[in-house]
Amino acid sequence: MSVFEIKHPLVQHKISLMRAKDMSTRSFRQLSAEVGSLLTYEATKDLELENFQMEGWDGEITGQRLVGKKATVVPILRAGIGMLDGVLELMPSAKISVVGLYRDEETLEPVTYFEKLAGDIDQRLALIIDPMLATGGSMNATIDILKKAGCNDIRALVLVAAPEGIEKVKSAHPDVDIYTASIDDHLNESGYIIPGLGDAGDKIFGTK
């Protein structure tokens, strides 16, 4: 397992803006998509290409195109939806698989209430998207669902991650790489990431 903390200046600038207490829903939503797009760029750097011949404006040229596994984007509902448009900007043909989870506020454990996966997910690269990797419970539950469906090429894209969540995913799924804009300090007693972003779902959907 590898953890990639993306230190690109644009990523760091945008994730810092998202931490502001007075961030509007519109701005938070837009930045979630933008950082999601930048994380997708980093997470797909190793996709396989092949050469092919094509007609250019001045005759035949050699181009390159993607080959190998196609992708499916897996937003964890509901907050993962906030990153989806940004991912699809770069991968508009990707199928969308959906996993719905909520965190039990007493046990902090994930509860699955919905899942709808691409029919051929066992043949696809899965990009799980969720703004927060906090305790790691929701991420592990989603990975479990994907693996049960036969998908074994999985990457996780999160805006911010807590060290505790990273370790939990690493322990359960050492084959899954994580891409994040920031590895934050710790979880508080309520299971929220510090300094974190607050409740990303509420901020994206305007229900805070």
Swiss-Prot record:
Gene3D superfamilies: 3.40.50.2020. Uracil binds at residues 193, 198-200. 5-phospho-alpha-D-ribose 1-diphosphate binds at residues 78, 103, 130-138, 199. Pathway: Pyrimidine metabolism; UMP biosynthesis via salvage pathway; UMP from uracil: step 1/1. Its EC number is 2.4.2.9. It catalyses: UMP + diphosphate = 5-phospho-alpha-D-ribose 1-diphosphate + uracil. Catalyzes the conversion of uracil and 5-phospho-alpha-D-ribose 1-diphosphate (PRPP) to UMP and diphosphate. Binds 1 Mg(2+) ion per subunit. The magnesium is bound as Mg-PRPP. GO terms for biological process: UMP salvage; uracil salvage. Belongs to the UPRTase family. This is Uracil phosphoribosyltransferase. It comes from the Bacteria. Its cofactor is Mg(2+). It is an enzyme of class 2 (transferase). GO terms for molecular function: GTP binding; magnesium ion binding; uracil phosphoribosyltransferase activity. Keywords: Allosteric enzyme, Glycosyltransferase, GTP-binding, Magnesium, Nucleotide-binding, Transferase. Allosterically activated by GTP.
